[in-house]
């Protein structure tokens, strides 16, 4: 169905090949995992599959890509769009309207599909994806998981034969990830060819027919069983409930911030927290629980409707919407922006530690999702602040870079407090020493992590699956 024959690609104004003589074949009806370290070439492969290269991204392409034995370059872009559905890591980039129903019919309207056929396809997709409760809603006010389903639904209305999902679990809680697994299984059983570019593998391991590992622009094809036993490619865990704590520490009584009976509309109610220097707080809860709202209040982006936030803190928030936090034309100038007095050695050491040194002259918007994430973390680390907050900091991160980020954040906690909103239990166990669980608009649990309280974390995540 999809075949790459000796494909190499170099982006315009770059001398380095992103892909080098790549060969593989994906058969009809297969569910394929595309994985590899951040920046290895996964996104380039995806963009070649769906026609964004060369339609949007210029460069030198050699070799051939075939779809159903026809050269992809001879197929018109709109035909590729109909046959090969694509859902990016951030589905908001797909949307052209603010209403879920309007969005689901938008692509069909553009392809001139008849009204009767549009209604038929719309109803079929709503039933398949169980979208009944989120149709005719404002896209801005539904959860990340619900946006993901709408984006998938938009692709399915065109009746594609191939569906590409780019990091589909990156911002989803355990409950929504479980629903995503069920959805992928449904699509597979209906005969769709599914390609999943992903670092987190635990939730789809039983559905995968083959694995394509991208490493330094080259491809290695293996089975899922081979992947479980490999030693030459560091993996995100396949068993999220069999992990060890790596940051057990006693409570520090050096108070940094007091949140006193704070509410925000009907999103958060009567929140009270004491935050101490040295705390690395894992802020957990389902999508829509209010985690992002709490972080924004602590950064003064939003003001509480009731209660007080007391303390002399300098906050810094790394948001999910990474592109909104870039202002300059290179990685190096981005780090220097607002940090002009920081020594060069300190900047270079941090770039080296987070694997960004070779990208220091690159435009931030051209980085991969994982590289953007690490750039913002490096800016936070070098800024003169004492309360650092991160909203899903591991989205798009492979195992190696997740470990690098964890190490940097633990070092930062020695003189500061950190709050990390995350669904990533592996990262949480590596990095955090305290858990705050938001549920039903308020704090349900607040405890320091040790081997005894670890079982409580398991119970919370299992509860979030239900």
Listing of model-derived features with the role each one plays in the protein:
Residues 58-70, 307-315:
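Conserved ABC transporter NBD signature motif
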Residues 152, 377:
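Hydrophobic anchor residue at the start of the ABC signature
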Residues 173, 398:
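ABC-family nucleotide-binding domains
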């Amino acid at each position: 169905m999809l075949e790459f024959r000796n494909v190499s690609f170099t982006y315009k104004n770059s001398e380095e090949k992103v892909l080098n003589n790549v060969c593989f074949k994906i058969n009809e009806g297969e569910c394929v995992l595309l994985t590899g370290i951040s920046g290895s070439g996964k996104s380039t492969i995806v963009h070649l599959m769906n026609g964004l290269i060369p339609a949007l991204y210029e460069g030198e392409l050699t070799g051939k890509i075939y779809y159903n034995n026809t050269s992809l370059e001879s197929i018109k872009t709109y035909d590729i769009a109909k046959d090969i559905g694509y859902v990016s890591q951030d589905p908001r980039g797909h949307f052209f309207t603010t209403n879920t129903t309007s969005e689901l019919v938008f692509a069909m309207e553009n392809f001139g599909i008849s009204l009767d056929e549009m209604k038929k396809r719309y109803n079929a997709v709503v039933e398949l994806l169980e979208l009944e409760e989120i149709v005719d809603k404002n896209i801005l006010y539904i959860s990340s998981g619900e946006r993901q389903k709408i984006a998938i639904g938009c692709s399915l209305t065109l009746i594609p034969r191939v569906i590409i999902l780019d990091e589909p679990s990156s911002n989803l809680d355990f409950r929504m990830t479980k629903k995503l697994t069920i959805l992928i299984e449904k699509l597979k059983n209906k005969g769709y060819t599914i390609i999943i570019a992903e670092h987190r593998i635990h939730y789809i391991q039983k559905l995968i027919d083959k694995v394509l590992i991208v490493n330094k622009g080259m491809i290695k094809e293996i089975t899922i069983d081979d992947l479980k036993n490999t030693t030459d490619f560091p993996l995100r865990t396949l068993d999220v409930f069999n992990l060890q704590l790596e940051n057990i520490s006693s409570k520090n009584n050096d108070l940094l911030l007091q949140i006193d009976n704070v509410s925000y509309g009907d999103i958060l109610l009567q929140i009270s927290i004491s935050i101490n220097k040295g705390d690395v707080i894992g802020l957990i809860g389902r999508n829509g629980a209010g985690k992002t709202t709490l972080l924004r209040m602590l950064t003064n982006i939003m003001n509480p409707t009731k209660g007080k936030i007391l303390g002399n803190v300098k906050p810094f928030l790394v948001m999910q919407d990474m592109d909104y936090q870039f202002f300059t034309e290179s990685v190096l100038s981005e780090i220097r922006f607002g940090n002009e007095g920081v020594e060069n050695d300190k900047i270079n050491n941090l770039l080296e530690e987070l694997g960004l040194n070779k990208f220091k002259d690159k435009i931030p918007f051209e980085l991969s999702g994982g590289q953007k994430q690490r750039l913002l973390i490096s800016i936070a680390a070098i800024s003169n602040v004492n309360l650092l907050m991160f909203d899903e900091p591991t989205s798009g991160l492979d195992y190696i870079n997740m470990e690098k980020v964890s190490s940097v954040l633990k070092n930062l906690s020695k003189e500061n407090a950190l709050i990390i909103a995350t669904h990533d239990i592996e990262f949480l166990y590596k990095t955090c020493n305290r858990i705050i669980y938001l549920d039903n608009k308020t704090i349900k649990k607040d405890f320091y992590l040790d081997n005894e309280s670890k079982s409580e974390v398991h119970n919370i995540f299992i509860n979030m699956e239900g």
